[in-house]
């Protein structure tokens, strides 16, 4: 229902309880389209809070907490895979009665979004990728170093030591403290499963199967992925748009959230009403 902001819960087909937020401040009398917006690894959908005032005025925005993140339960030994994360998106859409929907993701959330669009082209109206190469396998991430560092020091200390790499030009100490505390809520053992799983992913050979309009927003100074690693989208997805954020490191969706949301909104409005 328009003019609302709520946190809700559903049960996936494997029994895991999934949490999701719905924000909708679009005109109640107008046609309604839904955007499913997927957060990055660590933290939860709360990391995308600054996007909501911009996007929810025009779209119903659904933000799931991925498995093991935020208010969603930690998955059991056999309940975490990329296939399962993709299935969660489709089951959430089914739960909400959505035949088709817009889809966007940040970093690891983009990996889930891309897989969903590849496997379910008939369901996805548009796809937006923020700061993700086609999987983490071709990226520059040393996942073993990350996991070992987090296990040895804990999430909070690990993030505090690497915060300058993520946000070299951010001066708001309150934001930096909030980011660390929010991201550090992630279960260490969960990330030790989630991170290496994502590091095995490379969608390059499947990108041609993305049939919907696609937006790629890429950080121009990303230590986790080179420009060449991002350019593969141009080679394999001809119906794509590209925006480079010159000089910015990986965490663009946190450091310049309003800019991200505004660029996404421009893209979505161009395709609104074409379902």
Regions found by a protein language model. Name each.
Residues 83-100:
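Conserved acidic catalytic loop of the alpha/beta-hydrolase fold
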Residues 111-119, 123-153:
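Flexible "cap/lid" loop of the alpha/beta hydrolase fold
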Residues 230-251:
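Catalytic histidine neighborhood in serine/cysteine hydrolases
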Residues 248-261:
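Catalytic histidine-centered segment of alpha/beta-hydrolase-like enzymes
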Residues 137-141, 153-209:
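Conserved alpha/beta-hydrolase catalytic His-Asp/Glu region
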Residues 210, 216-218:
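Short beta-strand/loop motif that positions the catalytic acidic residue
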Residues 16-74:
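Conserved HGGG/HGGXW glycine-rich cap/lid loop of the alpha/beta-hydrolase fold
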Residues 220-225, 250:
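Acidic catalytic loop of the alpha/beta-hydrolase fold
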